[in-house]
Amino acid sequence: MHKKKYTFSMWMKYLEKFDKKDRKNLFELKLIAKKLGLLNLKSFFFTVGGTNGKGTTCAMLEKLLLDSGYQVGLYTSPHLINYSERIKVNGLYLSEKDHIFSFLIIDAEKGNVSLTYFEFITLSALFLFSQYSLDIIILEVGLGGRLDATNIIDSDLSVITNIGIDHTSCLGTDRISIGREKSGIFRKGKIAVIGEKNIPISVDEIAKEKKTILKKIDVDWFWTRTKIDSWNFIHSNIELYNLPVSRIPLSNTAIALASLFYSGLEVNLKKLKSSISKVQLSGRFQTVFNSPRIILDVAHNVHAALYLSEKIDEIDTEGQIYAVFGILKDKDVAGVVQVLQKKINYWYVVNLKTNRSASINYLKKKLSLNNALFFNNINESWQAIKKVITKKDIILVFGSFFTVSEFMSIKDRRLTLY
C-alpha cells in the first residue's frame, strides 16, 4: 500500500521498524532539515537535557511562557499512551491528520537516508512547528545530547537539569563521560542553565571549549524551601518570595524559572504564582486514585529513585505500601530497588510488553527480596493486588515509562472494582 493511504496507526507501526543504529554525527540529519528549511526557524529555542527532570522542567517552562502571552511549541519524549503527547502547539495536541501530513513530507524528503525512529519524529516535530508562527520552541533532548536529533538546532539557551548514571551503553559508565555527552547541546556565546550543584568537571571543560556561559545553581541563582507550602527563588535580576509549592519537583520548577529569566524574555510576574501551582505531568508522582491511593511514577534510575524515596517519606499512611514494579534490562535494577527496599512492604514484580524488559527470571536472580511476587504482566499483578489491598494502603506503580503506560491502559476499567 502506498504511504499516502496509511492511517495513523499504520504510520506508528512503520516508524517502530526503523533502525536503532548509533550515529557518528548529525550531518545527514542536518542535511534533510536544511532542505526542509527547519534550521532557520525564527523562534527562540530552549533545549533541555539532563538525566532526570527534563519533562517536568519543559512542562513548567511551557506553562510560564504561555501565561506570559507567547506562542509556544513543545516537543517531549517519550509518550505514555499516545504518540500525539510528544508535540504540543500553544498547549494543545495536534490532530492525527496533522501528524500524517508531516510524516509524508519527512518520508519523501529523507529519500534513501536511514533514520532512527527518534530522528524521524524530531524532523516531523520541527516541520509541524514550522507551520505556525511560534515565538518559542522547547525541545526535550531524547538521549544524551551531542548526537541527539534535537541537537541539529542551535538553541538560544540550553539546560542541563542534572547528570546521573543512565544509558551507560551509549553515554559512558561515569558522570564525567555522561556530562561530556550531555554538554554537547552547548552553543558558543549562549547561556546554559545548570540545575545540579556538583556537576562533573567535563561540563565546565566543554563550556570553556565552546565559550558557553554557564549559569549554575547556588552560584548564579538560588532557591530555598522556606515552609511546607512556600519557597523562594533568587536570581541576579529578581527575587521572588513565598512562591507556591508546585506539583512537580521544586528543583525543576526552579530550573524552569532560571531558564526563563536568563533567556531575557519578558515574564508576566502577575501570573507567575498561578502558573507554578497548575503544572502536573502524567506519571510524575501522580495520584490517580484515592482510598487506596494509587501513585504512578516513571522513576527508572537511582537518581529518580532517591527522589521517589523522599516523596514516599512525606506520605502519612496507616497502611502498607505495595509496589507494582517493572523495569528495563539495561537499567541499574539492583540500585533502584536498594534505594526503595525499606520503604516498600510488598513487591509485585512484572514483565513488561517490550523486548527491552528485564525478564522475570532475570529479576528473580538479580533481586534478593523476601517480600516479592513475580507476574508475567501488569494485569496479573493488578488482579492479585486487588485481593489483598485495603483502603488504607498505597499502590506505587513505577520502574519505567512502560510500566506506567501499561498500568494506565488498564486502570480506568479496573478501579470500579474497589
From Swiss-Prot:
Listed name of the protein: Dihydrofolate synthase/folylpolyglutamate synthase
Regions that span the bilayer: none
EC number per UniProt: 6.3.2.12, 6.3.2.17
Gene coding for it: folC
Entries under InterPro entries matching the protein: Folylpolyglutamate_synth, Folylpolyglutamate_synth_CS, Mur-like_cat_sf, Mur_ligase_C, Mur_ligase_C_dom_sf, Mur_ligase_cen
GO biological process, any: tetrahydrofolate biosynthetic process
Alphabetical UniProt keywords: ATP-binding, Folate biosynthesis, Ligase, Magnesium, Metal-binding, Nucleotide-binding, One-carbon metabolism
GO cellular component assignments: cytoplasm
Binding sites annotated in the UniProt record for 7,8-dihydropteroate: T116, Y117, F118, E119, L147, D148, A149
Family from the record: Belongs to the folylpolyglutamate synthase family.
PANTHER family listed in its UniProt record: DIHYDROFOLATE SYNTHETASE-RELATED, FOLYLPOLYGLUTAMATE SYNTHASE-RELATED
Xref: Gene3D superfamilies: Mur ligase, C-terminal domain, Mur-like, catalytic domain
This protein's pathway: Cofactor biosynthesis; tetrahydrofolate biosynthesis; 7,8-dihydrofolate from 2-amino-4-hydroxy-6-hydroxymethyl-7,8-dihydropteridine diphosphate and 4-aminobenzoate: step 2/2; Cofactor biosynthesis; tetrahydrofolylpolyglutamate biosynthesis
Top-level taxon: Bacteria
Residues that hold ATP according to the record: G53, K54, G55, T56, N252, R284, D297
A molecular-function term among this protein's GO annotations: tetrahydrofolylpolyglutamate synthase activity
Residues that coordinate or bind Mg(2+) 1: S77, E140
Purpose of the protein: Functions in two distinct reactions of the de novo folate biosynthetic pathway. Catalyzes the addition of a glutamate residue to dihydropteroate (7,8-dihydropteroate or H2Pte) to form dihydrofolate (7,8-dihydrofolate monoglutamate or H2Pte-Glu). Also catalyzes successive additions of L-glutamate to tetrahydrofolate or 10-formyltetrahydrofolate or 5,10-methylenetetrahydrofolate, leading to folylpolyglutamate derivatives.
Cofactor, how bound (note): Binds 2 Mg(2+) ions per subunit.
Quaternary data: Monomer.
Cofactor(s) listed: Mg(2+)
Reaction catalyzed: 7,8-dihydropteroate + L-glutamate + ATP = 7,8-dihydrofolate + ADP + phosphate + H(+); (6S)-5,6,7,8-tetrahydrofolyl-(gamma-L-Glu)(n) + L-glutamate + ATP = (6S)-5,6,7,8-tetrahydrofolyl-(gamma-L-Glu)(n+1) + ADP + phosphate + H(+); 10-formyltetrahydrofolyl-(gamma-L-Glu)(n) + L-glutamate + ATP = 10-formyltetrahydrofolyl-(gamma-L-Glu)(n+1) + ADP + phosphate + H(+); (6R)-5,10-methylenetetrahydrofolyl-(gamma-L-Glu)(n) + L-glutamate + ATP = (6R)-5,10-methylenetetrahydrofolyl-(gamma-L-Glu)(n+1) + ADP + phosphate + H(+)
Residues reported to bind Mg(2+) 2: H167
